[in-house]
Amino acid sequence: MKLTTFAPEFAEALPILEQIEAAGFEAYFVGGSVRDNLLGLPIHDVDIATSAYPAEIKQIFKRTVDTGIQHGTVMILDHGNGYEVTTFRTETGYQDFRRPDSVTFVRSLEEDLKRRDFTINALAMRADGEIIDLFDGIADLKAHKIRAVGVADERFHEDALRMMRAVRFESQLGFSVTETTQAAIEKHAALLEKIAIERIHVEFMKLMQGIERQNGLRTFIDTGLYRYCPDLADQLLALERLTALPTEQLHDESAVWLVVTYLLGQTPAQAGRFLKHWKSANDVIDAVKAGLVLLPKLLTATADQWDLYQAGQAVLVISLQIAQMVTTATIPTADWLERYDRLQIKQKADLAINGQILMQNGFQPGPILGKALAILERKVVLDELPNTTEALLKAAK
């Protein structure tokens, strides 16, 4: 197969390939960018593989940065954008089931592609658009299949995170893992315990945010991968409920964790501990905990202005999305958003009075002043007082 037109990302990087080839070496676009181009999807990162060793690349180009030279990767800065170029390599020994114990630079593209995870990611493209497909990756693209390169057992022993990548690609691309590859995942699922939680987190989040979330979740469950993720080992029923939800795509990380923790039946405190185990960011944890307070009130239509105010707009939006997913009842989303918009204040700083003004009018600093401000804040939110300095001062006195 030969492409006659190039995506802009490839066109911009072509001078890199041409300069390497002019020096007598091979160079190709490789990996996910080639796959996504063939699928008509947006290209995010352009990866280049070459037969030139790092020292040779640094002789060819004037401006380079050693971003991962021990693994053969050099960033080239000569043509505006930074492009990472990696020498063809083989890898041996995977004591931690994630990183190779040793890397050997080679001159063979085939040897380099053999070590890649899936056939759809083991594609290379020449500067003239010719696609190099040594493992039937194009056929698998057309069949919407995710198949390990070579022996699946070996690929997952080399890097156990690849098992999570498989189910993530199912979700992102709407593909299906082949029977042989799925059997290997089931066989080696326990190796996932060797992988850093942060890396599992990234893949799980991409799985949950994909266009075919149910596909990825189904394999995630059927292979037993879930048993080796933080606090999910005994949560099969909740995960099954997750697969049964409507297919609406989730874009926000907080929305993902809100629906997960809600279906797990967690309290805000339990969710906080759960998400700490998953190494989630503090702002995500805070949003999920707030969502777990608001969500049941949206489902029962019992939320008042104070509930909406405490949650804030961002939490309200994700809570409404999840509410629509977890119930067959109609959720009046527009009405809830309108009620939020009508709030006199959206945050404490919007209050027409503050501690300084109160002290100027006879209040002493201390707990009483803080309590007075809290009472005024609540009364304004609940429309029991107008948000004017005059009215609030009068009420405070």
Swiss-Prot record:
<dbReference type="Pfam" id="PF01743">
    <property type="entry name" value="PolyA_pol"/>
</dbReference>
<dbReference type="GO" id="GO:0001680">
    <property type="term" value="P:tRNA 3'-terminal CCA addition"/>
</dbReference>
<protein>
    <recommendedName>
        <fullName>CCA-adding enzyme</fullName>
        <ecNumber>2.7.7.72</ecNumber>
    </recommendedName>
</protein>
<feature type="binding site">
    <location>
        <position position="159"/>
    </location>
    <ligand>
        <name>CTP</name>
    </ligand>
</feature>
<keyword id="KW-0808">Transferase</keyword>
<dbReference type="InterPro" id="IPR043519">
    <property type="entry name" value="NT_sf"/>
</dbReference>
<dbReference type="InterPro" id="IPR023068">
    <property type="entry name" value="CCA-adding_enz_firmicutes"/>
</dbReference>
<feature type="binding site">
    <location>
        <position position="165"/>
    </location>
    <ligand>
        <name>ATP</name>
    </ligand>
</feature>
<dbReference type="GO" id="GO:0042245">
    <property type="term" value="P:RNA repair"/>
</dbReference>
<feature type="binding site">
    <location>
        <position position="35"/>
    </location>
    <ligand>
        <name>CTP</name>
    </ligand>
</feature>
<keyword id="KW-0819">tRNA processing</keyword>
<dbReference type="GO" id="GO:0000287">
    <property type="term" value="F:magnesium ion binding"/>
</dbReference>
<keyword id="KW-0694">RNA-binding</keyword>
<feature type="binding site">
    <location>
        <position position="162"/>
    </location>
    <ligand>
        <name>ATP</name>
    </ligand>
</feature>
<dbReference type="GO" id="GO:0004810">
    <property type="term" value="F:CCA tRNA nucleotidyltransferase activity"/>
</dbReference>
<dbReference type="InterPro" id="IPR032828">
    <property type="entry name" value="PolyA_RNA-bd"/>
</dbReference>
<keyword id="KW-0547">Nucleotide-binding</keyword>
<feature type="binding site">
    <location>
        <position position="165"/>
    </location>
    <ligand>
        <name>CTP</name>
    </ligand>
</feature>
<feature type="binding site">
    <location>
        <position position="168"/>
    </location>
    <ligand>
        <name>CTP</name>
    </ligand>
</feature>
<comment type="similarity">
    <text>Belongs to the tRNA nucleotidyltransferase/poly(A) polymerase family. Bacterial CCA-adding enzyme type 3 subfamily.</text>
</comment>
<keyword id="KW-0067">ATP-binding</keyword>
<comment type="subunit">
    <text>Homodimer.</text>
</comment>
<dbReference type="Pfam" id="PF12627">
    <property type="entry name" value="PolyA_pol_RNAbd"/>
</dbReference>
<feature type="binding site">
    <location>
        <position position="159"/>
    </location>
    <ligand>
        <name>ATP</name>
    </ligand>
</feature>
<dbReference type="InterPro" id="IPR050264">
    <property type="entry name" value="Bact_CCA-adding_enz_type3_sf"/>
</dbReference>
<dbReference type="InterPro" id="IPR002646">
    <property type="entry name" value="PolA_pol_head_dom"/>
</dbReference>
<keyword id="KW-0479">Metal-binding</keyword>
<keyword id="KW-0692">RNA repair</keyword>
<dbReference type="InterPro" id="IPR032810">
    <property type="entry name" value="CCA-adding_enz_C"/>
</dbReference>
<feature type="binding site">
    <location>
        <position position="47"/>
    </location>
    <ligand>
        <name>Mg(2+)</name>
    </ligand>
</feature>
<keyword id="KW-0548">Nucleotidyltransferase</keyword>
<dbReference type="Pfam" id="PF13735">
    <property type="entry name" value="tRNA_NucTran2_2"/>
</dbReference>
<feature type="binding site">
    <location>
        <position position="116"/>
    </location>
    <ligand>
        <name>CTP</name>
    </ligand>
</feature>
<dbReference type="GO" id="GO:0005524">
    <property type="term" value="F:ATP binding"/>
</dbReference>
<feature type="binding site">
    <location>
        <position position="168"/>
    </location>
    <ligand>
        <name>ATP</name>
    </ligand>
</feature>
<dbReference type="GO" id="GO:0000049">
    <property type="term" value="F:tRNA binding"/>
</dbReference>
<feature type="binding site">
    <location>
        <position position="116"/>
    </location>
    <ligand>
        <name>ATP</name>
    </ligand>
</feature>
<keyword id="KW-0460">Magnesium</keyword>
<feature type="binding site">
    <location>
        <position position="45"/>
    </location>
    <ligand>
        <name>Mg(2+)</name>
    </ligand>
</feature>
<feature type="binding site">
    <location>
        <position position="162"/>
    </location>
    <ligand>
        <name>CTP</name>
    </ligand>
</feature>
<feature type="binding site">
    <location>
        <position position="32"/>
    </location>
    <ligand>
        <name>CTP</name>
    </ligand>
</feature>
<comment type="function">
    <text>Catalyzes the addition and repair of the essential 3'-terminal CCA sequence in tRNAs without using a nucleic acid template. Adds these three nucleotides in the order of C, C, and A to the tRNA nucleotide-73, using CTP and ATP as substrates and producing inorganic pyrophosphate. tRNA 3'-terminal CCA addition is required both for tRNA processing and repair. Also involved in tRNA surveillance by mediating tandem CCA addition to generate a CCACCA at the 3' terminus of unstable tRNAs. While stable tRNAs receive only 3'-terminal CCA, unstable tRNAs are marked with CCACCA and rapidly degraded.</text>
</comment>
